């Protein structure tokens, strides 16, 4: 799998308007909700106006956004925000902004403080979220937010108060007419055309295992571990440096590209270790034209998803976390259903060979359960795709929280519908 001619990676902070090849949405009937329709918002009795809904999936690495009913997001925008210090802003005068998002981060001559508003998938900096959404509405999509309903994804096990924050920001700052916020895991399962299953999601900053039955998260059973794709990238950089290369945090966008183009999960890592360099190596051309050779690092980096102790983490590996969750489903009566529908989601699961390795490890841990692992080709955007399906269904329209409802009932309106 030579990558010598692979395109140079784009710097972090790129607003990527080309989401790639379009897929197809599962039939709404398959998702367990019958009929499709436009978003309809009741503003006054006997008066209904149609509104085009937006779907926003705010991830630790990228914010995916686009219109409901589309097969894939329109934009992938970096979740990193560049901030000028007060001193830098004062020196720059009125000609420079204080905050930079998306393509604005490219080719910046002045150094910026880079801020990621999410920690392990959960929002910790709401000012940056506002900056990102302003960029989405006004720069990327060039829309008036007060003319669109917005569906927002929320990670499992995040504070319930975050849903209130989403509502306050969207209604009070952007003046949107309606919103809904729902679990990322629930949206992911809809992307598979299912309403029941065990969602195993690993993105950039966090991984979850969430059992869902008929559209409901089974209470007390979702599990989370605080490692994911960014940890794999950092581990790959460590392995490459141990092999004699000299990468630093400034080169993480290059390491990320190497991970996507060169790395894989070995089905039998012990056998892979015995292979010679001539059987394993690939050449990779760096942006400056230098060519490096990558060997065992190609598959060794992914081992941390199965043995997190390799990166100093005491939490269980993804197969073990999944097996434990399955065992806990025994008392609910849903174990057999969950084992038959183990659904991989998130960008970290896109690593070549990962589904097969995960299936093997899980089968060894649960020999009596005969677990069946599914890996949809478009699972990198499973959360957004599920949101696109959900927000376009006629049966869902009654679950929008309108601005009027929020003004009248406050946060109670959110919890009654979301």
From Swiss-Prot:
Gene3D superfamilies found in the cross-reference section: 3.30.420.40, Actin, Chain A, domain 4 (3.90.640.10)
Annotated localization: Cytoplasm, Cytoskeleton
Domain of life, per lineage:
Eukaryota
What's in the keyword line of the UniProt record?
A: Cytoplasm, Cytoskeleton, Phosphoprotein
Where are residues bearing Phosphoserine located in the sequence?
A: 8
Q: Which GO terms describe its cellular component?
A: cytoplasm; cytoskeleton
Q: Region Disordered: what ranges?
A: 1-42
Free-text tissue specificity from the UniProt record? Testis specific.
> Which family would the database say this protein is a member of?
Belongs to the actin family.
PANTHER family, per this entry?
ACTIN
UniProt name for this protein? Actin-like protein 7B
Q: What is the organism lineage in this UniProt record?
A: Eukaryota, Metazoa, Chordata, Craniata, Vertebrata
Q: Which gene encodes it?
A: Actl7b
């Amino acid at each position: 799998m030579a990558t010598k001619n692979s395109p140079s990676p784009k710097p972090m902070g790129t607003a990527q308007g080309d989401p790639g090849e379009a897929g197809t949405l599962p039939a709404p009937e398959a998702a367990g909700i019958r009929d499709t329709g436009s978003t309809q918002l009741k503003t006054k009795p006997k008066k209904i106006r149609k509104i085009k809904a937006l779907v926003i999936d705010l991830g630790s690495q990228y914010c995916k956004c686009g219109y409901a009913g589309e097969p894939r997001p329109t934009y992938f925008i970096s979740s990193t925000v560049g901030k000028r210090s007060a001193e830098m802003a004062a020196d720059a005068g009125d000609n420079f902004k204080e905050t930079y998002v998306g393509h604005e981060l490219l080719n910046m001559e002045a150094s910026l403080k880079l801020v990621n508003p999410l920690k392990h998938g959960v929002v910790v900096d709401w000012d940056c979220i506002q900056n990102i959404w302003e960029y989405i509405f006004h720069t990327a999509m060039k829309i008036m937010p007060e003319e669109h309903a917005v569906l927002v994804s929320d990670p499992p096990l995040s504070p319930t108060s975050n849903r209130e924050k989403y509502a306050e920001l969207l209604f009070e700052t952007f003046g949107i007419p309606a919103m809904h916020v729902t679990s990322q895991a629930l949206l992911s399962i809809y992307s598979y055309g299912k309403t029941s299953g065990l969602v195993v999601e690993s993105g950039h900053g966090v991984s979850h295992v969430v059992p869902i039955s008929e559209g409901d998260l089974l209470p007390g059973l979702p599990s989370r571990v605080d490692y994911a794709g960014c940890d794999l990238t950092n581990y790959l950089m460590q392995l490459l440096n141990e092999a004699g290369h000299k990468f630093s945090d400034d080169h993480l966008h290059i390491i990320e590209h190497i991970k996507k183009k060169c790395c894989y999960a070995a089905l039998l890592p012990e056998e892979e270790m015995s292979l010679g360099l001539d059987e394993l190596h690939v050449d990779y051309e760096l942006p400056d034209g230098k060519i490096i050779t990558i060997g065992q690092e190609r598959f060794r980096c992914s081992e941390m998803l199965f043995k997190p102790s390799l990166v100093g983490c005491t939490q269980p590996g993804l197969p073990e976390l999944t097996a434990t969750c399955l065992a806990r489903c025994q008392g609910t009566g849903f174990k057999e259903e969950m084992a038959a529908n183990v659904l991989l989601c998130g960008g970290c699961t896109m690593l070549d060979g990962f589904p097969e390795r995960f299936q093997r490890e899980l089968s060894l841990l649960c020999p009596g359960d005969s677990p069946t692992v599914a890996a949809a080709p478009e699972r990198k955007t499973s959360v957004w795709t599920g949101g696109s399906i959900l927000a376009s269904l006629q049966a869902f329209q009654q679950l929008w929280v309108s601005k009027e409802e929020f003004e009248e009932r406050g946060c109670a309106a959110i919890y009654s519908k979301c």
